[in-house]
């Protein structure tokens, strides 16, 4: 199986690569369109700022390529947000794979800290990514923007209010949390994606 990780100006690519290696998978980290198109699975990770990153994707043509991939594609954190219609971070139009907008967390109480950082449970899982999961699985989040619960929600969590911990539509899968930083639970998410 050929797994490609999209290389672009976003952090966290190496930690995804290490997580895949722990599962015995040698991924190719690349921006080469032919390699991405011919891969069996594509992972679209990211830590960064939505506006700057979308500008880079558009300048390189990776925006159109990612939208048109037909194999399973897995967006992580910023990768998930960039798969949405629009982001309040940078007020930028995104890939519009998921017809939903990315919103900024607004603290409601003094103890609400932004970014949402740390371990949280996920529930209402509705995707093959979460095969074998219980209702109380802990995963690791680091983000200041979120995707509301919507028709594409594949898992939910709650911080300040309920939001999408994962999305799924056709061949596109995505998590707001970082499976590569979520221990054995995260490894199971990655393995379930690779087994699709």
Swiss-Prot record:
Places the protein is found: Cytoplasm
Origin: domain of life: Bacteria
Catalytic activity: 5-[(5-phospho-1-deoxy-D-ribulos-1-ylimino)methylamino]-1-(5-phospho-beta-D-ribosyl)imidazole-4-carboxamide + L-glutamine = D-erythro-1-(imidazol-4-yl)glycerol 3-phosphate + 5-amino-1-(5-phospho-beta-D-ribosyl)imidazole-4-carboxamide + L-glutamate + H(+); L-glutamine + H2O = L-glutamate + NH4(+)
Domain Glutamine amidotransferase type-1: from-to ranges: 2-196
Main location class: cytoplasm
PROSITE patterns: GATASE_TYPE_1 (PS51273)
Pathway membership: Amino-acid biosynthesis; L-histidine biosynthesis; L-histidine from 5-phospho-alpha-D-ribose 1-diphosphate: step 5/9
UniProt entry tagged with the keyword Amino-acid biosynthesis: yes
GO cellular component: cytoplasm
GO terms under biological process: L-histidine biosynthetic process
InterPro entries documented for this protein: Class_I_gatase-like (IPR029062), GATASE (IPR017926), Imidazole-glycPsynth_HisH (IPR010139)
Active site: 77, 178, 180
Keywords on record: Amino-acid biosynthesis, Cytoplasm, Glutamine amidotransferase, Histidine biosynthesis, Hydrolase, Lyase
EC nos: 4.3.2.10, 3.5.1.2
GO molecular function: glutaminase activity; imidazoleglycerol-phosphate synthase activity; lyase activity
Extent of the signal sequence: none
Record note on quaternary structure: Heterodimer of HisH and HisF.
Role of this protein: IGPS catalyzes the conversion of PRFAR and glutamine to IGP, AICAR and glutamate. The HisH subunit catalyzes the hydrolysis of glutamine to glutamate and ammonia as part of the synthesis of IGP and AICAR. The resulting ammonia molecule is channeled to the active site of HisF.
NCBIfam families in UniProt: IMP_synth_hisH
Protein known as: Imidazole glycerol phosphate synthase subunit HisH
Phylogenetic lineage: Bacteria, Pseudomonadati, Bacteroidota, Bacteroidia, Bacteroidales
Annotated gene: hisH
């Amino acid at each position: 199986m050929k797994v490609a990780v999209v290389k672009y100006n976003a952090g966290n690519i190496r930690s995804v690569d290490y997580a895949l290696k722990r599962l015995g998978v040698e991924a190719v980290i690349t921006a080469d369109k032919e390699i991405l198109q011919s891969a069996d699975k594509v992972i679209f990770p990211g830590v960064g700022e939505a506006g700057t990153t979308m500008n880079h994707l558009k300048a390189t043509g990776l925006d159109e390529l990612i939208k048109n991939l037909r194999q399973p594609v897995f967006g992580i954190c910023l990768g998930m947000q960039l798969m949405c219609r629009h982001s309040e971070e940078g007020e930028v139009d995104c890939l519009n794979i998921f017809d939903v907008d990315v919103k900024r967390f607004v603290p409601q109480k003094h103890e609400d800290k932004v970014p949402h950082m740390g371990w949280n449970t996920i529930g209402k899982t509705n995707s093959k990514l979460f095969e074998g999961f219980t209702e109380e699985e802990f995963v690791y989040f680091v983000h200041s923007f979120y995707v509301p619960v919507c028709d594409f929600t594949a898992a939910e969590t709650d911080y300040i209010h309920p939001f999408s911990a994962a999305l799924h539509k056709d061949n596109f899968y995505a998590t707001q949390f970082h499976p590569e930083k979520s221990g054995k639970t995260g490894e199971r998410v990655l393995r379930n994606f690779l087994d699709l």
